[in-house]
Amino acid sequence: MLASSAAFAERITALSEIVVTASRIQESISSVSGNITRINQETREQVGHTHINELMQRVAGVWISRGNGQEHLTAIRSPVLTGAGACGAFLLAQDGIPIRANGFCNVNELFEANTEQASAIEVIRGPSGVTYGSNALHGVLNVLSPEVKPVGKVTFEFGANDYLRSKLIYGGERYRADMHGTRDGGYKDESGFDQQKLTLQRHVSAEQTSHHTVLHYTNLNQETAGFIRGANIYRDRGQTRSNPNPEAFRDARSIRLTHRYTNDLGASGELLVTGYGRWSDMVFLQHFLPGQALEENRHHSIGFMSSLHTGAFVVGLDADITQGQLAETQARTTVGSPFLVATIPAGQHYDYDVDARTIAGFLDWELILGTNTLLTAGSRVESVIYDYTNHLPVGRTRADGTRCDFGGCRFNRPASRSDDFLNVSTKLSLLHDVSAALQFFGQVTSGFRAPQTTELYRLQADQSVSNIDSESIRSVEFGVRGFGQRWLLDASLYKMTKDNFIFRDTNRRNVDNGETRHQGIDASVHWFPNQTITASLQWSLAHHEYDNTPALSGSEIRGNEIDTAPGSFGSLQLAWTINPTWDAELEWTHLGSYYQDPENNHEYPGHDLLNLRLFAQGLLGWDWGLRIMNVADEKYAERADFAFGEDRYFVGEPRRAFLSVTIPL
């Protein structure tokens, strides 16, 4: 609430001195020589997101494309990337620890983080390979666990389509528990999900040291609805509830245990060591592919991340050991042409294990130039080794070793083998303070991602060996941060070039000869015209294009815009503190037009949505919230693409309302 000039001044100060963890330790945002955005707990609670897409509207340059249920695809200074290893372009973490192990990502893995009860979510746009290593290619999204402190409250929420959610928070000086459960009946026919998340924490500190232990558990049981097909069918309300794949489902569980040790070494610096273990298990029906095979994937890991911050230097060592498995089994005969029926038979398609080892070291060095300028240079060297073991006959055969007609089965199992990748990332940045309220920064950075295990060992057609190498990206960025008595500004201009882009070509081979270019501007502006009104704008202008003609298409596509890459997107929030009890917010979200195919022949026109939120604090001793989403009842698509000769859409939901009440304990 902003009911007084003192509170107003405090908010200005808080926004201009946000504390972040871009370098693994807390520091003022004014010390960061690059872009970073932080969504704080207050914003997260006000948004009350039912899907991570709703919350990330508050970050310029980020689009989390909403699928069905809790599914999503990610874009951070990039198109929405699809394919077996597309998720490897982003480092998604909780408390700095990657949600999934190197080589074992999943495009939907953000639902394995407790974003609904986070103290903050931080986003770094562009490569951040020195600190985070492989997968920090297009960006980093880090979910921070809530602060351990005395607190107690329970929240109940009710909404459209039989939506029910309950949250419980209880904590003391050393312990804290955050848990929530959700049941969503689903807008689409025969869809919906049940989801539970739990975060348990223990924090103990002494004069110079601290120990912080966190346990995360997530469980998702989802009845998944598929794309609806047909040009502009998302505009037909008679079809938007239809579900062509009522048989589809996804079950996913995850556990992560971390222990962070911090030692304040005084004049010698600070030592940080975090040990962790992770376990993930997922089963889902591939309803989007011919044959609809069942995929089962799981992996478990142990590892540590460490850094020593001393004087002008930061030195770190990270290591991870992971064991992963993947199996694909088709229960029924494929429906379709004689070719599909013959080449995609029922039975086991893949069954393999991968033992992975990652070790990396990095160094950051800071040099103060004069009184107002800071130069930072850094480098990271990372080694990734995969030992792959195949448990089925090698090649394009059925599980019993017999060959398929038409030259062999679609799937191709490579022989057991080992692969290793050595990558180096660098950064050089400059931060200059013009005044206490205005600073400029510039940086030249690089990033990489090792191939995902599915890109190497889940082969198709006549490809028996995948000789792909790591993707790499180079970025140049210039930015400005400033604030005044009634405004805040954070904007950056960037240009990136990506080489060795990995994709599946028209012959169904995994290859790595793609080249793409990415450029744009991201801006965030906050304006406080008086003590009761706040206006916040997050906006991105971007252009993503193919820089060569990879075999994604039979056409020349160099210079074409990459599909699912809107040229503009963003959001505007107008918040009004009506009185000490009541607040209101009107939100406009914009998604510009984008092409649905590499040939740029099919286009989605984009859409604009309005959302309304009302809050009552302390009314009858409780806190109340009302959200009305898609106030104008716009007909739109959350995602549009063109595949198998058809337009396909994940349909946006019509106007809907959610009511919540929070009761203190």
Map each language-model feature to its residues:
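Short acidic/polar hinge/loop motifs at secondary-structure boundaries
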Residues: 97-125, 143-144
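Extracytoplasmic beta-strand/coil segments of soluble accessory domains associated
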Residues: 21, 53-97
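Membrane-embedded beta-barrel scaffold of Gram-negative outer-membrane proteins
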Residues: 167-171, 271-286, 433, 439-445, ...
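Gram-negative outer-membrane beta-barrel transporters
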Residues: 314, 368-375, 383, 488-498, ...
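Structural signature of Gram-negative outer-membrane beta-barrels, strongest in the C-terminal barrel
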Residues: 312-320, 352-496, 528-530, 540-543, ...
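Short strand-turn segments of transmembrane beta-barrel domains in outer membranes
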Residues: 89, 128, 140-170, 178-179, ...
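Transmembrane beta-barrel wall of Gram-negative outer-membrane proteins
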Residues: 158-183, 188-225, 246-271, 369, ...
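C-terminal beta-signal and adjacent terminal beta-strands/loops
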Residues: 590-597, 615-665
